[in-house]
Amino acid sequence: AGYTFLIEQYEPGDEIFVFGFSRGAFTARSLVGLIRASGLPRHTEAWKAPQALKRYRSSDPATKPSSEESHRFRLGYSPDVVTSQKEADWRRAQGHPVPPLLSITYLGIWDTVGALGIPGYYKWLAQVFNHSQGFHDTQLSSMVMAARHAVSIDERRKTFPPTLWGNLGELNRENPDRKRSYQQLWFAGDHGSVGG
């Protein structure tokens, strides 16, 4: 629903802010991953969204966001924006016009839980369902200009461990002018206290 809303409403130059708590934080991170992988088609082409989701779910290395195949896909699917400088350079080298860079202005999330609805105490069911949803790209992308993740330090339930970002140091080093734009901090309290 969030992706379709953006397709229908986004105009180049708009700022995009994405927020979520718990499983909603996982969904917010997945939405940003989908945007990074596919871009956004024109309003009149919202019917193309299933193509993007199918590619996003694929484990084929050719569908990774930075691959040349993905650049080709976005050229046809999302011609009015690029999702990275690498893609802009690729379009220029191929003789195509270079549209504006699509970015996420801010991603704010609280206590991301990666389990998509099946608690761990239903172990076999959780493994089947959660594995089938394992395509989600929840790593932080440099297309996000600033991001914060508040994580509860006192949560003791083993069924929903937090899903942490592992690449913040790298992103902060690559973007020193942004002054620690990417942060993941622990806060006192359990899951409901930090997010509620």
Predicted ranges, named:
Residues 1-196:
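Alpha-helical segment proximal to the catalytic Tyr-Lys
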